Structures are given as structure tokens and as C-alpha cells.
């Protein structure tokens, strides 16, 4: 995948979630939750501040993150893979 996000944008590949209930029933459709965790695939150069300087991002390629899937999150298919394009501010935590 050859993609370079701009500014404070981050490309994330959503992690797979277990699609079975605690009782072993396979969940489909709206019953199956989508994960809000994923792996960072690419990061932009950073946020441009009012004084023109660039503030580097806190996340790096390979980080596992928890994100808020809100209004500003864009879903795209790149090389047949669904990825999310979001601002660093939509990330809530880095999982170690």
C-alpha cells in the first residue's frame, strides 16, 4: 500500500473482532460489533500550528490504537483493503 496522509491525518486498519457471543452463537449484521482498535499504517508529517511550525504526531507506523469512530472518520478502499483515514485527535490511546 502506497499512501501518504497529509498533516495530522493517520491511516488505520481496523482490527478483526470475535464474531461469536459468550454462548458461542455466531453474530452477524448489526449484532456483530465493529472494533474501535486498529494498526497505524501511515502517518502525516504533523499538525501545522498557527505560527507555521509543524508539531509531529505522537503515533507511529505499527502502533495499535483505540480510536473514536465519529463524524470525521473516512472509510476508503485502497488496494482492495478497507482502511480508515482520521485525524490524530480521533485517536484515544496507544495500546502497548
Swiss-Prot record:
Database matches in PROSITE patterns: CHAPERONINS_CPN10
Family matches, as InterPro entries: Chaperonin_GroES, Chaperonin_GroES_sf, Chaprnonin_Cpn10_CS, GroES-like_sf
Predominant location category: cytoplasm
Keyword set, alphabetical order: Chaperone, Cytoplasm
An annotated GO cellular component: cytoplasm
A Gene Ontology molecular function term of the record: ATP binding
Subcellular location(s) of the protein: Cytoplasm
Function: Together with the chaperonin GroEL, plays an essential role in assisting protein folding. The GroEL-GroES system forms a nano-cage that allows encapsulation of the non-native substrate proteins and provides a physical environment optimized to promote and accelerate protein folding. GroES binds to the apical surface of the GroEL ring, thereby capping the opening of the GroEL channel.
Family per record: Belongs to the GroES chaperonin family.
Protein name according to UniProt: Co-chaperonin GroES
Phylogenetic classification of the source organism: Bacteria, Pseudomonadati, Pseudomonadota, Gammaproteobacteria, Alteromonadales
Gene name linked to the record: groES
